[in-house]
Structures are given as C-alpha cells and as structure tokens.
C-alpha cells in the first residue's frame, strides 16, 4: 500500500507589483532592489498571474497502487516527516521545458523546497516554475507561498534554463523567511520579510517537482530536462542533516488513474543530499 500523501495548496494573487513583505534582491553586479522591471516584464508577469489564479494544488491520492514509495498525481521528489522542522535548503540548475507552446493547452511545472504540506494543510515554500499555453508564452519564474497566511507570490519572470538556483525556508518560532536566489540572471532573487504562522505544524520538509491542478484536475506536465537537486540540508529540533537523516518518503508522480509514471525521483546519493527527478510523460 502506498503511504502518506502530500497535501499542497498553491493559489495566486493578482498583483502587478511585489507583495508586501517581499524584499527583492539584486545579485552581485546587478541592479539594486529598487529597480523597476521594464514594461514588457511587468506585462509578462501579469499574464503569468492570470493563469495562476485558477490553480489548485491539493494532492489527489491514488487508490489501489502498491508501492514501497509514496504515490501522487502531482508531486515527485522527497518528503521528510517528523516534527519541529525549522529549516531546509537545496540547490539546482533550472530545468529546460519543451513540448510547450503559447497556443497550446496550459501546462506548468514548479520546483520547490518547503516545510509542511505533506501531512498538514499549511505550506511554507519557495522555488521556481515554468508555465505556458492558453495564450501565454513559455515563462520561467521565481515564487514563494505561505498558505493560508499568504497565497502564491510570483516574483521574477526572467529565469532561464540553466540558471543556478538556491532556495531555503528558515523558521524561528512562528516566523518564516523564504529565500530564492538566482545567481545567474538578475531580477529573480528575493528574500521575504518574516512571515507569521501560529498554526503551521512543522511536520514535514520537502524537495518537490510538481504539476499544478485546476478544478478539472492536474495540468499536463510539460517535458523538463532532469531536475537535479544538490546540497539538500534540513534541521528539526537540535538535529541537522540531509534528506536521509530523517524519515524520508520517495514520492513518484502518476497519472490520474495511477496507470503510468509521469515523473520519478532517483535513489538518494550516498550522502543523502542529492537526487535526480526525471520526466516520463505529460499525462
């Protein structure tokens, strides 16, 4: 029998400017945080936000699938479970998206690290993503979310395949700081101000590739080059370690009926801090 299933909420706010509490960061040698994006970038960001407004990300459990790993119709990666998680981080190179066109159906993939959401209804997370279709050109972006305190906040829309990304979530008491850094392309990095959540369970930590869902079900998963997660670190209570230092759940993404694999993580490396997530099919 498959084990616990993640529960994840991802919704958007229509906003033409960064949300309150967000500190945009210039990378070394780039424009300062006060830089205003060009009109074309602002328009693109609004177009992305319009698509994001109808996303929902509650996991859909698969019935009758027998696995040693966890089965999901929208998540692929690793989730640690336990209690008192206070930080996690990872690095990756932004995957390249293909079979994705402006005039085609809406497709999306997001890659993130986060606390909670696997066995709770709160989510504190940040990462990168790509969206296309329904009249919007293929666009890569950075984002963060606190749910239910905040919904998804799209930040930079200038991410490119091959960009070097690092992401972290750090909790101090009931305050969370989410940071995503694009060390390759300016205008995508950010650090949030401390975000409050007194009801967050801090019961899981995740490194996940995901396809969002709408009211009609999960979106098609665009083909992505292998997402390689490295330098994954996590802390819970006084214990610090890697993914394998805690109870780790390997999450494989299946289509809606559980008939075939859409994305699948590799085994962890010997250090327990790296894995590869491989695209298999769109739907």
Which sequence ranges carry the predicted segments?
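Exposed, interaction-prone regions of secreted/extracellular proteins
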Residues: 2, 12, 32-283
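Secretory targeting and sorting signals
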Residues: 2-34
């Amino acid at each position: 029998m498959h084990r616990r299933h993640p529960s994840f909420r991802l919704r958007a706010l229509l906003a033409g400017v960064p949300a309150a509490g967000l500190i945009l960061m210039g990378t070394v040698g780039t424009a300062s945080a006060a830089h205003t994006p060009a009109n074309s970038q602002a328009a693109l960001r609004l177009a992305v936000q319009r698509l994001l407004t109808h996303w929902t990300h509650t996991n859909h459990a698969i019935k009758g699938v027998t696995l040693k790993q966890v089965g999901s119709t929208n998540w692929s990666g690793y989730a640690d479970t336990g209690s008192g998680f206070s930080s996690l981080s990872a690095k990756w190179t932004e995957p390249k998206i293909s079979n994705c066109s402006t005039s085609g159906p809406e497709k999306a993939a997001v890659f993130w690290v986060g606390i909670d959401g696997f066995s709770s209804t709160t989510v504190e997370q940040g990462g990168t993503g790509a969206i296309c279709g329904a009249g919007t050109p293929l666009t890569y972006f950075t984002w963060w979310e606190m749910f239910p305190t905040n919904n998804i906040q799209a930040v930079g829309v200038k991410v490119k395949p091959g960009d070097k990304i690092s992401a972290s979530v750090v909790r101090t008491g009931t305050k969370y700081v989410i940071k995503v850094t694009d060390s390759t392309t300016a205008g995508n990095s950010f650090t949030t101000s401390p975000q409050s959540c007194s009801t967050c369970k801090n019961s899981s930590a995740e490194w996940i590739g995901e396809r969002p869902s709408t009211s009609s079900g999960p979106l098609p998963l665009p083909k992505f080059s292998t997402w390689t997660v490295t330098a994954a670190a996590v802390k819970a209570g006084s214990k610090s370690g890697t993914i394998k230092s805690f109870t780790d759940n390997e999450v494989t993404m299946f289509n809606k009926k559980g008939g075939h694999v859409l994305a699948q993580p590799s085994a962890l490396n010997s250090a327990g801090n790296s894995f590869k997530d491989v695209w298999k099919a769109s739907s």
